[in-house]
Amino acid sequence: MEVLMAERANLVFHNKAIDGTAMKRLISRLIDHFGMAYTSHILDQLKTLGFQQATATSISLGIDDLLTIPSKGWLVQDAEQQSLILEKHHHYGNVHAVEKLRQSIEIWYSTSEYLRQEMNPNFRMTDPYNPVHIMSFSGARGNVSQVHQLVGMRGLMSDPQGQMIDLPIQSNLREGLSLTEYIISCYGARKGVVDTAVRTSDAGYLTRRLVEVVQHIVVRRRDCGTIRGISVSPQNSTMPERILIQTLIGRVLADDIYMGSRCIATRNQDIGVGLVNRFITLRTQLISIRTPFTCRSASWICRLCYGRSPTHGGLVELGEAVGIIAGQSIGEPGTQLTLRTFHTGGVFTGGTAEHVRAPSNGKIQFNEDLVHPTRTRHGHPAFLCYIDLYVTIESDDILHNVNIPPKSFLLVQNDQYVESEQVIAEIRAGTSTLNFKERVRKHIYSDSEGEMHWSTDVYHAPEFTYGNVHLLPKTSHLWVLSGKPYRSSVVPFSLSKDQDQMNTHSLSFEQIYISNPSVTNDQVKDKLSDSFSKKEDRITDYSELNRIGHCNLIYPAKNLDLLAKKRRNRFIIPFQGSQERKKELMSLSGISIEIPINGIFRKNSIFAYFDDPRYRRKSSGITKYGTIEMHSIVKKEDLIEYRGVKEFRPKYQMKVDRFFFIPEEVHILAGSSSIMVRNNSIIGVDTWITLNTRSRIGGVVRVERKKKKIELTIFSGDIHFPGETDKISRHSGILIPPSRKNSKDSKNLKKWIYVQRITPTKKKYFVLVRPVVPYEITDGINLATLFPQDLLQERDNVQLRVVNYILYGNGKVTRGISDTSIQLVRTCLVLNWNQDKKGSSIEEARGSFVEVRTNGMIQDFLKVNLVKPAISYISKRNDPSSEKKEGSDHTNMNPFYSIYIYPKTKLQKSFNQNQGTVRTLLGINKECQFFLILSSSNCFRIGPFKGVKYPKELIKKDPLIPIRNSFGPLGTALQIANFFSFYYLITHNQILVTNYLQLDNLKQTFQPFKFQYYLMDENGRIYNPDPCSNIIFNPFKLNWYFLHYHFCEETSTKIDLGQFVCENVCITKKGTHLKSGQVLIVQFDSVVIRSAKPYLATPGATLHGHYGEIIYEGDTLVTFIYEKSRSGDITQGLPKVEQVLEVRSIDSISINLEKRIDSWNERITRILGSPWGFLIGAELTIAQSRISLVNKIQKVYRSQGVQIHNRHIEIIVRQITSKVLVSEDGMSNVFLPGELIGLFRAERTGRALEEAICYRATLLGITRASLNTQSFISEASFQETARVLAKAALRGRIDWLKGLKENVVLGGMIPVGTGFKGFVHHSSQHKDIPLKTKKQNLFEGEMGDILFYHRELFESCLSKN
């Protein structure tokens, strides 16, 4: 007893809480001290003590023990506030849907996480012995996330697809859930239960398929003698050391490893922990290891390529069924992992960024040169810092220094005042291995119907110019302008024209015309019978020509059948002249009317051209003009491209009335092709020039070598060998007209000839007389008659001039590319117009095509608008308003902030329902014409202010007058007596234009005063319609804002016509906002806005549909591709593994795929040197794809924290990639094209027959690979038994019973383990292949070096791990 006491005195007294590790240490020390039996006795006593104490404390769990966290209330409130602001920004078009979703998820996730962190301290402070606290934090029962759901908040749930439900559950289970929350909660929690049931079977099936693929792979040899390997570099910093060690341990080296001249490891040595650590410490360059990929045996594997057995740590035994082990090791974790979803009840887990908060109130300062402005993934403006940034916060007396790590977002501006705990920066969340990201497509759908417009800064990806898909190069808005679409197939609208007014509820079209006093009854019948071609003078009654200011409609005469081959800015009017029909030689030709891309014509610009078929040639040749001195009207060089507009500058006004064409035959051949004729030799017709082309004409051959091609020209004609006396110009040829006499034969020439001197050698020369085809240029078809002249003369003196010009210069050689005909002369229509009488010059015209449907036939019009240039008139000095205007005259402000509008808040709607405007648009399918019927019922108007000075008699009356059918711009006519008014009209050039309008009372008999206004639509058309007429501009949904009348005294109003306005950008003194939309009318005291909804789109997004296309509610507008983190559980992981193994691709092809392939090709040639670059390319492709497949599968399992050795996956991947597809050419006598054969078999056959074999590497899924094996018995026992057996019987297949499954089915001995011995003698003679081959075959050795020693290539593959 005393001894015990003495010992006890020596023992250390511990007074600590004991946890698992301390317990382990204690037990091990007890065992060391007392032995096993005594220790177990002590531990028993401990257990009893524990139970006693627990009984005495009487820990029980009651509902009162669930204490909620006090700070929860304001945290939730704060999050709701943030969500509200976010919703507003989305509505204004500042952030798009993906950013909104992403941010709302992060707001709620961080709130929930914050609560979770608060939980523990809260318990510790308020009630440290709380049973819930003791239980969950000691690890006895329950974990933090479950307690968090009880007392914190349940937070965000994920739906069965693993997507987020962005409505958070704010309550916890202690408080009880609301109905919505309960339903969402059940939705999420049910997922766990269902998944477990469903996925267990999936995982089982996956295992079965995997085992099926590799069941025959057994270790059958010690060494296959391969010299290949896969290189791994320990210096490669991208790969974590842990993964590197995992990759290397248990493998076998494929080559000796030297450190300088010292060999530190030899070939075929297996790598242990010690060796790996040596590699890492010595930082060896490249380690070449053997893997199942490099094994040379076709249907089994050798010990050295497999490496160590995972069970006993030595090299794997002969006869071990490594295939089945591999299949099970991949399939098994799937079954285990499915059960994990169960416990959290579908609560979403994801990552958020960490925040840096301000330590105190104060002014923040940092170095602005170190940061760059950017847009965060939530759409907020921020600064990005690339290096460590030091931020100082200066409060009353203290300076705080905050260090912000690199690659963080700074969310505040310099010198801004920040409050304590305000978020000033966001640290990018480090990508943790647990939640891997994936690319998701998100479609944005339209909420309203209308017309689609883009902001001005949307470009097309060049390859999609005429397609329906547009990529965005930079952030911009997409607008859906309101309006109600109708299809034109409905009867009542078949006669309406663009910009007509019509009654939306009327069933017959006549009512409109008759109810309109300006059209009489017989005109209606006239129009109904044939609305276009009756009498052209009558048409002026119609709204288009006399109502729209500055719009000339040029439309074709009636005899033309108008077939519009539409492109975006050109169409062709085909027609056949009567002379052509007789000949019927040429195909249908037409006039192409072409509009410049920006729609602007300058003076003298070509507006249509016609390719006359008489001036077409099939063959190549040279054009010459009548004499050498003459010039063409237009040289090709003088067609100056001016902003995409072809413009004429007539240089030589000499009229060319004839030109000559000298035919020749030209062949352009590849540089490598063999030519069968000599230079300057003379050949006959139909001679073979190359292996597969013959000459069409006879004559002299001229061969010229250009950069990469050979140009072979054949000149036809007679050959004369002249005497000494003849003097022929040494220069290029001479044209000899028919009248002249030839010096030699002195007989008259019937035709023009062209004499050319050819000198094959220095002394000899001969003369080639070549035939010439003369062309007279006549007036041809008078194009101007196609367009009625009187219409053009009527207004603004638009003229069309016909110009013929020769497309090729004098002596220029024309080349026809592969049988296309060459047009020699093109007839052009040049648009010109005279100056106005007043002398105001019109610089440019805008062209656009208008389509109008009448009587079921669509007609196309070309509309040419003359746009007056914007000139600012400065008013006279004595005008009191002009001094104030002077300063704001040319200011160019940011268009968003240049709007100052003073509307009154009261909204008055007093319009009746039945007015509307037709606006025609081209639909998606070109045949069906769409109309937008726009009713004026949606117009908003904000009434006049107090400041507006009206004439006295008007003040008594209400300024709003009920609508009569044809009044006013929006159906309102304000009766205001005659007075001066001026207003600003700002075109796109942002130069102020002040118009003084003086209205003459005598002209208006209908009402005392009419509004004047301008309206501009997207083509830049400016209207100045007459309110009495039957045309009303498009009242889409219009918002009419009244501005302040005396704006000269207060501020000048700047609004661009056609400008898009976002909601909430123009904040005025009075504090009212505009709605979002497009500005249509600027008036002296008001502005009209067509309401529109903006959608933000960021770069890389895909737009659907064309500009100006009609959008219905629910149509897809934009597709975003964005990355998001998956919620971490294997239910999403398993299908991923399956996708990779079954080779099903769901990824969208990345936009820069081609570039990547190109750079990869360049890299291969750079590494391998060009000679056999692509021979090895095929092999490398297979290697590369195998490695990336392994990486993909590993990524999924690693994200779940499951470790699978690479070699298991490699065995499977080797089977998937082991087959190739025989292509059509080559080996036709052995294999059928399209047959699947083994890669090794293909190579062996190729070697045996010494013939090249063409094949394509394929990826088979595991199911297909199981059905394409050597053994039909194994295939039949897997799937499709009847089909497989029937096929095998018909083909007479033989099963060699090499695998396990066949032997099991037939009850034989399986060839693995002990049964392997009976199998050995087959392969004994190949047992050891001498390794000298490596030294003998130098070339193969070098290839091995080149292939596998280049780090560049495989670094990229392995780094993805």
From Swiss-Prot:
Q: What is this protein's name? A: DNA-directed RNA polymerase subunit beta''
Co-factor(s): Zn(2+)
Q: Which residues form the signal peptide?
A: none
Question: In the record's cofactor note, how is the cofactor described as bound?
Answer: Binds 1 Zn(2+) ion per subunit.
Question: GO molecular function of the protein, one example?
Answer: DNA binding
EC identifiers of the protein: 2.7.7.6
**Places the protein is found:** Plastid, Chloroplast
State the family named in the UniProt similarity comment for this chain: Belongs to the RNA polymerase beta' chain family. RpoC2 subfamily.
Q: Which HAMAP family match?
A: RNApol_bact_RpoC2
- Where on the tree of life does the source sit, at the highest rank? Eukaryota
Q: Which GO terms describe its cellular component?
A: chloroplast; DNA-directed RNA polymerase complex; mitochondrion
Provide the binding site for Zn(2+).
C224, C295, C302, C305
Classification via Gene3D superfamilies: 1.10.132.30, 1.10.150.390, 1.10.1790.20, RNA polymerase Rpb1, domain 3 (1.10.274.100)
